[in-house]
Amino acid sequence: MTAAWTDYDTHARTRPRGDFWGQVRRTVRGQPVAQAQIDMIVEAAVAHLALEPGDRLLDLACGNGALSRPLFQRCAGGVGVDISDYLVSVAREHFAGPAHGYVVMDAAAYAETAAPDGITKALCYGSLSYLADDAAARMLRALHGRFPALRRILLGNLPDPARAGLFYPAGAAAELREPRSSIGAWRSPVEVAALAGPGWDVWCHTMPPDFFAAHYRYDAVLVRR
């Protein structure tokens, strides 16, 4: 159990059970982001994944399921996976449906051991930066090797090291590499592609300027070769 996981799980338990965005720190100055911002995330995910009614979606590090739910409603269902039993309990209480459910498991371990279950699209939003390089690479390569129907993965809300100067002084390179820091590891598109391995083409996108994190984050879309 890492310090980052302990902080993630402990923080979630300090928030009211219905404070879905506060539990997963999808906030600005401590306040939950506006619904319009969430809608932007959902629409971008649908577009980047080319999500269709017949798709089955895997949400890795899904948190409490609040972001998964509107995506599952756009497809044929699937599964959300998170390491926090508390957040998965919130997801099961508020967001489970007849065609999708939530599982307590480490994201990389799930990719390496779970049945493919017809998964065609996958999402890891705002969480890849908290995985160490080895775990991230194992997860992405296992998804390619073990999930033959999986065509696209969205790695969303990645902190861009080219923008780190907005937050950190020069010489803070060590902290930028640390997945246990408050923002996690800052990785360039080239570094993300290296983690993904040769089985994926990687395309990077930025959100519109009025998105709350557009000034320092980007999305990476992995497309099976």
Question: Which residue stretches match the model-derived regions?
Answer:
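Conserved beta-strand/loop positions that form the S-adenosyl-L-methionine
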Residues: L60
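Short catalytic micro-motifs in class I SAM-dependent methyltransferases
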Residues: G126-S127
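A conserved beta-strand element that flanks and buttresses the S-adenosyl-L-methionine
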Residues: L123
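Short acidic/histidine-rich motifs immediately flanking catalytic phosphotransfer sites
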Residues: G118
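A short glycine-rich, Lys/Arg-flanked "PGG" loop and its adjoining helix->strand segment in the class I
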Residues: A137-A149
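Class I (Rossmann-like) S-adenosyl-L-methionine-dependent methyltransferase catalytic domain
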Residues: M1-P53, N64-A114, L131, R138, ...
